[in-house]
Amino acid sequence: MNEKLPKHVSYSSYNTWLECGWKYYLTKLEDVQEGHAVWFTGGSAVHKATELWDKHGGEAETVWNDAWFQQVKEDEELNGDMNTWQFAKREDMSWWYGEGIWMLERWIKFRQGGWNIYENFIEKEYEIPVGDTTVRLAIDRVMTDFDGNRVLVDIKTGASSQRHPLQLAVYAWALQAQGISVDKAGFWDARTGTISTWNIEHLNPDRIEEMFTTFDKARKTDIFLPNFNNCGRCGVLSYCKWMNGQHTKEMGKVNG
C-alpha cells in the first residue's frame, strides 16, 4: 500500500475517485492543488453565516458581513489574491457578496417557518470506523419540522440541482452509528429557500458500508483509472499524464 494514501475516506473523496481515479491520485497522494474558485469561498461563507445565525441570532446583514469577510481573509491567506480565483459565468466575488445575504435571509425565513434545530445539532463532525478505514464527515443540521419530524438537512449553495440522495444516506448512516435516527432527509437550496426530501430506504447501512469498503480496497490496490469524460472541468489537468499536461514532467515517476 502506498504510504502517501490518506488514512481516512469521505463522501467527497469517494466522489473524486468516481469522477476520475487519476484526479484522486494526484490530489490525495501527490498533493497537487486545484486552483481555488470563488464558489468555494461563497459557499463556505453561507454555511458559516447560517451557523452563526443559528447559534447567536442577529441582523442578517451584520451576520453576513462577519462571515463573508472572515472567509475571504482565510481563503486569501491560503490561496492568494481573490482576483486570481476562478468563477463561473457572472458569479464573481461581487455576485457572491450580494447574493450571499439573500441566501442567509432565505435561511432565516426557512427557520422561522417552523423548522427548529434538534438538540443543538449544528455542523457536527464524525469519524466512523468501517472495515480497515475510517469515514470522516461533517453534517450540517438535524432539525425538526413543523410536524415534529426529525430531519437531516444538508445546505446547498451551488447552481446544480441534486440528482441522487447518496450523500444524505451516508450522513443518515453516520447518525445511526451515533444512535440518532431521522424520519426524513433533504437538501436545502440556498438559491430558492426550499427543501427537497428524498427516500433513502434503499441505501441502507449495509449498502453504505459495502460502498466504502470497496472504495478502500480499490485505492489500496492502486486502482486509479482516468475518466476522460470529466477533463473539461478538471482542476489538475495540467499535471495529468493522460492529457500531456504542461506540468507532467514535474511529476517525475508519478506520470512516467
State each model region's role:
Residues M1, G148-N149, K253-G256:
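Short intrinsically disordered terminal tails
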Residues A49-E125:
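A non-catalytic, helix-rich entry segment at domain boundaries
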Residues F121-W173, A177-Q178, R207-M211:
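Non-catalytic protein-protein interaction segments used by genome-maintenance enzymes to assemble
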